[in-house]
Amino acid sequence: MNLERYTEQARQAIAQSQVLARESAHSKIDLPHLAAVMLRDAAGLPAKIVQKAGQNPQNIYQAAQSELGRLPKVSGTEGGQYLSSRLASALGRAEKLADELKDRFVALDTLLLALAETGYGGLQASAVRQALQEIRGGRTVNSEHAEGTYNALEQYGLDLTRQAEEGKLDPVIGRDEEIRRVIQILLRRTKNNPVLIGEPGVGKTAVVEGLAQRIVKGDVPEGLKGKRIVSLQMGSLLAGAKYRGEFEERLKAVIQETVQSAGQIILFIDEIHTVVGAGKAEGAVDAGNMLKPALARGELHLIGATTLDEYREIEKDPALERRFQPVFVDEPSLEETVSILRGIKEKYEVHHGVRISDPALIAAAQLSHRYIADRKLPDKAIDLVDEAAARLRMALESSPESIDALNRRKLQLEIEREALKKETDAESKFRLGELEKEIADLEEEIRKQQAEWEAEREIMQKLRAAQQRLDEVRTQIEQAERAYDLNKAAPLRYGELPKLEQEVNELADRMAGAQFVRPMVTEEDIAAIVSRWTGIPVAKLMEGEREKLLRLEDELHKRVVGQDEAIVAVADAIRRARAGLKDPNRPIGSFLFLGPTGVGKTELAKTLAASLFDTEENMVRIDMSEYQEKHTVARLIGAPPGYVGYEEGGQLTEAVRRRPYSVILFDEIEKAHPDVFNVLLQVLDDGRLTDGQGRTVDFRNTVIILTSNIGSPLIFEGIQSGQSYETIRERVFGVLQQHFRPEFLNRLDEIVVFRPLAREQIAAIVQIQLEAVRKRLAERRITLELSQEALDFLAQRGYDPVFGARPLKRVIQRELETPLSRKILAGEVADGAHLYVGSGPLGLTFEARPTAVA
């Protein structure tokens, strides 16, 4: 026996037989070892041949295993060192069969045929030989990896026309122009290879699926009728090709099978750019070069699909590119997207077992178009519908909230009951009796609601089963009508179909009044998914949120004292956005806050972020003092190609891509280089910015706040000379126009000059600052009370019209926090104490009281 004459898979089978004999402690390798190894994999080549020969491979495998269990075991010496005479004779016969079949190597299927000729396991040699020849398709074994080339299209391809016949493809709505153009190119004599080019998610693969469905229906010109579209899986072709030349052999077999079909098979390669360089190794030929000759001669019909960016890979090889005809697939319009969603709705309803309302489909198209900027229609709209239906299905299959709440209440009462059982006093016994009654009432209510929910769920499951059956019947009708089998089609179309449609409608009507199960996907469900994906609140306003928006000024005034103009301007912009009246192509609002230091410009931005998002974390703060040089603009939008940090993206663009709904604060903008403002022009006007990598970032759901100290000297001058606020404002605007370009100022929604703080406002700020001190003391359970004199002392010491509220912070630190920290460290103020702060001739006085005064 010359092992070099065997293919790689045949050698592996013999080696594994030896391993099996050794593990089983059998002295010889025999026919059952080889049979068990060959038929172990139900999807392997030997199992397929046995099945094609009309026998069950699993039965033969089980018989081989039982025979192995009966063979005598040896001990003391290592097993599997000899071939049995039966196996040696079978291997000799396999080599002779290879010569008869004109093979250069003994393949795995030849071994199986030799096994069949011994009569092992009841295998019929003639049937196995016929199956072998069918699978080989007239080819001979000329390489060590020949098995990988048998039935290459079946192994490495997916028949889209067969899937269309079985109703496994989603309906393709629209795209008629693209499908017609593909058909036109396929009917050419040479270079009849269309390549679909478009952005990810616009429906390139759907065009090919639409063509497969048209071929099945016969809705194509004569030249395409009866043809098969096979999608080639490049991953399967490459997977497991360990040895040089194995990948090329597989691809060659695919090309040969396609060419031999005499134009009956059209290959479809999704992500066709992967064939350029696929399988390339030193001295090897890549897939693209192997396809060229057959493509040029028109023997190979090929449809490709790739994105605009990745088509460049093919453009690098002009000889390959000229063999393709590009077909551009554009993003569908909103109306077309809604039509597509209506067409595929039924498939999703059947899969999830829920109904999808038409307004939900319209909302999915509109909201995805408006809020999900980095993806394309119809893909993003379909994803929204799919996820909303999955979310509803998950809710339907879990216990309703009302039953959960009752169960939690019952558990709480049961814990209380167990505690009261140990008490003996009359009051506890009375309470125990009340508890028993309440628990019994709860159990009754839970039982009642549980029964209702179970009944509704049962109807829901019946509805899902009926929808699935309806879908199956429609597919069967289509198949019967295509085959002109009217005896089968008529009873289905006029008997079973109307009956099932009526059943589905009746069950849907019964579900309409359901208390616990809501089987309909609505606009609110779609809006909730959009909010979860993007963080943008697009759901309908709840009553609480309406109140909050109407009282937004009061919320902002809690932390920002005075500055009514600025607060009203910001609050109005937020209300316009949430009511849906803002310009859809601009940010929610863009404001320039001017004024002296310490009057609340930055604090207002922080407060707005906290009231919109319940946390200041959602504020993107960019300190413009870091952007004083021209080249620092690249830090905002990302470095250009070829520079360090190109992959990282910009500080501004990346922050907004991750959180499209946020407050962006550009602090101290007058300190930045003038070129930075050129970047902001597009953001303020169109609500978009292109980063260093060419991606468009959407700023339409951001609030942009810029702060500046420009004109501060004029404000100080005006305050000291007693000028009115209006006069100061006019003078500040004059300075502003000298510093910033008109096109920048013209794009801002509002320019607000903050007023200097008055003495009364400082008194209100004292209370806000003290609240922060109280929060820090709360960790030690120390409460703080200040007399009116102490408050007046802090306000008077902290008032400085030129420096705003910041000196007040320093006064509180010096006069209150520092002496207080000394007293805590000295042990004069214990944890849990109540501290009373008064005012004396030398400053603040501290008196620790043991308990808090009510």
Curated annotation (Swiss-Prot):
<dbReference type="InterPro" id="IPR018368">
    <property type="entry name" value="ClpA/B_CS1"/>
</dbReference>
<dbReference type="InterPro" id="IPR028299">
    <property type="entry name" value="ClpA/B_CS2"/>
</dbReference>
<keyword id="KW-0677">Repeat</keyword>
<dbReference type="InterPro" id="IPR041546">
    <property type="entry name" value="ClpA/ClpB_AAA_lid"/>
</dbReference>
<dbReference type="Pfam" id="PF10431">
    <property type="entry name" value="ClpB_D2-small"/>
</dbReference>
<dbReference type="InterPro" id="IPR001270">
    <property type="entry name" value="ClpA/B"/>
</dbReference>
<dbReference type="Pfam" id="PF02861">
    <property type="entry name" value="Clp_N"/>
</dbReference>
<dbReference type="InterPro" id="IPR027417">
    <property type="entry name" value="P-loop_NTPase"/>
</dbReference>
<dbReference type="InterPro" id="IPR003593">
    <property type="entry name" value="AAA+_ATPase"/>
</dbReference>
<dbReference type="GO" id="GO:0034605">
    <property type="term" value="P:cellular response to heat"/>
</dbReference>
<feature type="region of interest" description="Linker">
    <location>
        <begin position="332"/>
        <end position="535"/>
    </location>
</feature>
<keyword id="KW-0143">Chaperone</keyword>
<protein>
    <recommendedName>
        <fullName>Chaperone protein ClpB</fullName>
    </recommendedName>
</protein>
<keyword id="KW-0547">Nucleotide-binding</keyword>
<feature type="region of interest" description="Repeat 2">
    <location>
        <begin position="83"/>
        <end position="147"/>
    </location>
</feature>
<feature type="binding site">
    <location>
        <begin position="198"/>
        <end position="205"/>
    </location>
    <ligand>
        <name>ATP 1</name>
    </ligand>
</feature>
<dbReference type="GO" id="GO:0005737">
    <property type="term" value="C:cytoplasm"/>
</dbReference>
<dbReference type="Pfam" id="PF07724">
    <property type="entry name" value="AAA_2"/>
</dbReference>
<comment type="similarity">
    <text>Belongs to the ClpA/ClpB family.</text>
</comment>
<feature type="domain" description="Clp R">
    <location>
        <begin position="3"/>
        <end position="147"/>
    </location>
</feature>
<dbReference type="InterPro" id="IPR050130">
    <property type="entry name" value="ClpA_ClpB"/>
</dbReference>
<feature type="coiled-coil region">
    <location>
        <begin position="382"/>
        <end position="513"/>
    </location>
</feature>
<dbReference type="InterPro" id="IPR003959">
    <property type="entry name" value="ATPase_AAA_core"/>
</dbReference>
<dbReference type="Pfam" id="PF17871">
    <property type="entry name" value="AAA_lid_9"/>
</dbReference>
<comment type="subunit">
    <text>Homohexamer. The oligomerization is ATP-dependent.</text>
</comment>
<dbReference type="InterPro" id="IPR036628">
    <property type="entry name" value="Clp_N_dom_sf"/>
</dbReference>
<feature type="region of interest" description="NBD1">
    <location>
        <begin position="151"/>
        <end position="331"/>
    </location>
</feature>
<comment type="function">
    <text>Part of a stress-induced multi-chaperone system, it is involved in the recovery of the cell from heat-induced damage, in cooperation with DnaK, DnaJ and GrpE. Acts before DnaK, in the processing of protein aggregates. Protein binding stimulates the ATPase activity; ATP hydrolysis unfolds the denatured protein aggregates, which probably helps expose new hydrophobic binding sites on the surface of ClpB-bound aggregates, contributing to the solubilization and refolding of denatured protein aggregates by DnaK.</text>
</comment>
<feature type="region of interest" description="C-terminal">
    <location>
        <begin position="757"/>
        <end position="854"/>
    </location>
</feature>
<dbReference type="InterPro" id="IPR017730">
    <property type="entry name" value="Chaperonin_ClpB"/>
</dbReference>
<dbReference type="InterPro" id="IPR019489">
    <property type="entry name" value="Clp_ATPase_C"/>
</dbReference>
<feature type="binding site">
    <location>
        <begin position="595"/>
        <end position="602"/>
    </location>
    <ligand>
        <name>ATP 2</name>
    </ligand>
</feature>
<dbReference type="InterPro" id="IPR004176">
    <property type="entry name" value="Clp_R_dom"/>
</dbReference>
<feature type="region of interest" description="Repeat 1">
    <location>
        <begin position="6"/>
        <end position="71"/>
    </location>
</feature>
<dbReference type="GO" id="GO:0016887">
    <property type="term" value="F:ATP hydrolysis activity"/>
</dbReference>
<keyword id="KW-0175">Coiled coil</keyword>
<feature type="region of interest" description="NBD2">
    <location>
        <begin position="545"/>
        <end position="756"/>
    </location>
</feature>
<dbReference type="GO" id="GO:0042026">
    <property type="term" value="P:protein refolding"/>
</dbReference>
<keyword id="KW-0346">Stress response</keyword>
<dbReference type="Pfam" id="PF00004">
    <property type="entry name" value="AAA"/>
</dbReference>
<keyword id="KW-0963">Cytoplasm</keyword>
<dbReference type="GO" id="GO:0005524">
    <property type="term" value="F:ATP binding"/>
</dbReference>
